[in-house]
């Protein structure tokens, strides 16, 4: 649709203008009406177009996509002391009661809070560190520290940490890398936003809490739509990757060292290779453009939590 409208615009507007020819009112009216009808048709039949694209995906891949989407809806909460709760409910009586019961049972806990990539990290812990019996996450979508979101209040997180500082053995944090690139694609890093994260983490460290800051994860930028279909047909899962996320990782390494913050680069550990790390034995390691799938949380988490640097930070204190 975009290409068709662009062609009409070029043929009947841009071309004549370049040749300094006037456009008749009739052609102008026809062009406007045609563009409107094309856009309207696209809007009306968007579901049919989407279904056509889905049908175009080979059946074996469609089954994998359906499985991945279904698993991504799982909420990993064991009903005991691996607690998965929203930031909005951080002061709810039921959550706080459960917290106190688990404190009596296990003592100190591993705490995570933030956005959807923190959720990926929590799920990876749930699936790869069975000996961690007391783990809490408070999370929200669209939770960048610089973005005002009533469902993601960093002051609530800091207040919770202040109230429970003697019982938090570690605080884990991570974030999506593209949120800290200028214009999403980079290549420049939006350093002032990363510096806001540093300030947030330093406030937690001031409570004498051990913090591990995990860098961004690879972003193949493949949605489960035409991008996936195109990648499959080209047998190339690197067509849309946001490679400049590595610039964010490098800057985070730099400022974490300057501020004495323990930092783990997921990029350095995973060494993501789309040829072998995206589609593995009929499993997709990502559920969308940047979030790990259930399989990916196990697959990448296993690499991270068995890395030497994680073991040094987490087990040797």
What are these regions (language model features)?
Residues 1-7, 11, 15-317:
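Extracellular/periplasmic envelope-modification machinery, especially enzymes
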